[in-house]
Amino acid sequence: MQTLLFYFFFINLIFAHDLNVKTYKPCTIPSVFSEQFTSEDITTWRSRWRAPVNKDLGVWDLVEAPGSHLRDEYGLITLKSNKPHILISNLENPTTRQSSSVPIVLSFQVKPTKPWTCGHAYVSLVHQSNPKNVSKEPPSVIRFGVKKCGMFDYISLSIISYDGKVSCHLYDAPPSGLVEGRTSMYTLLLQNTTVVIRRDQSVVYTGDVGTNFFHSPTKWITHSNVSNGYYTSRNIMSFLLSNNTNTSSYPFSVNGVELDVWNENAGVFINNIYFGFSLSDAMKFENETFIAKKILENSPCPNQPSIQPFGILMMLVSTIYGNFKNLYNCIKRNTIGYIYNSIYDFWITEGMLFPMRNMDIFKITAISIGLSIPVFLWLLK
């Protein structure tokens, strides 16, 4: 058994070393939209991606993948802290799904290059009435990504009507699994009423649009297929994901892709964005853009210099500093962080979206604070 493990370990090292000397090349897998950056895009990417001009936004830049072992792999990185970073890329032609049985697949890769304290990273499909209008942010139809802030840590999925008045959120979402310095890949599959979420090529969530979403409005509207005009959760999802314009008020038609990142720290790196209508093509895209990167990021780099005595001392100092930093962040998160982050989640990002799996943590925190106050007041006497 030990011999077998030893063999596989060194096979990974050899494979990693082989990949290390190769150059990243964008794959040519069919898609509705695919963005894979290289050094050739340094001067041209701004012609494909634009930012709304009526907002105080952060700045993006196209840089070589930080810590990457593949030469010439590039991506977009955020440069400002505590600023929303928004970019929109128009599709060459507006696209509409042919039937509800055709899967909608949306995928992207994200890598926090600095500690992720609080923030989100979304990739959205948008519907713009005037794609050339850069004065405002277009409404999202499907918003997919990650959100990690204090006790909140999950993969976020929202489906929104074209007018923005109907919005449904996944309430039992899985954890994000984000790790500083590591690339995470997230893939969304919507087919009929089934929702599947993949993280790093593994299925982490399977649900149904009629039972696993909430925050639907209870408003009366006129609709030809609903006799009483009442929007149930399943009806909303059917309307939003359908393309039959004769029977649905909300056909699935999009003409743009949006990046939306906000974080307390800069340095959120995003690349390898994919949108299409084929699950098999999406899996090929995952294989060609992520497998090599995953192996390399999880393998020791064979080109690292040997550690000298002075290097050992610096490593020890760095370890001690890191421990104190982690202690400080832990105290901060469990005191002021809870209060601030809760306000952030309730009012800044998604209104009243509150994942059900975090409710117990919220209750325990509230009870702990409630019990601590009388003790604190007693000690002051």
UniProtKB/Swiss-Prot annotation:
TM ranges: 304-324, 360-380
Glycosylation sites: N133, N192, N225, N243, N246, N287
Bilayer topology: Multi-pass membrane protein
Cytoplasmic side: 325-359
UniProt-annotated location(s): Endoplasmic reticulum membrane
Side Lumenal, residues: 17-303, 381
Signal peptide: 1-16
GO BP: any one term: intracellular protein transport
UniProt GO cellular component terms: endoplasmic reticulum; endoplasmic reticulum membrane
Keywords recorded for this protein, A-Z: Disulfide bond, Endoplasmic reticulum, Glycoprotein, Membrane, Signal, Transmembrane, Transmembrane helix
Family to which the UniProt record says this protein belongs: Belongs to the calreticulin family.
Protein name (database record): Uncharacterized protein P4H10.19c
Annotated organism of origin: Schizosaccharomyces pombe (strain 972 / ATCC 24843)
Taxonomic lineage from the root: Eukaryota, Fungi, Dikarya, Ascomycota, Taphrinomycotina
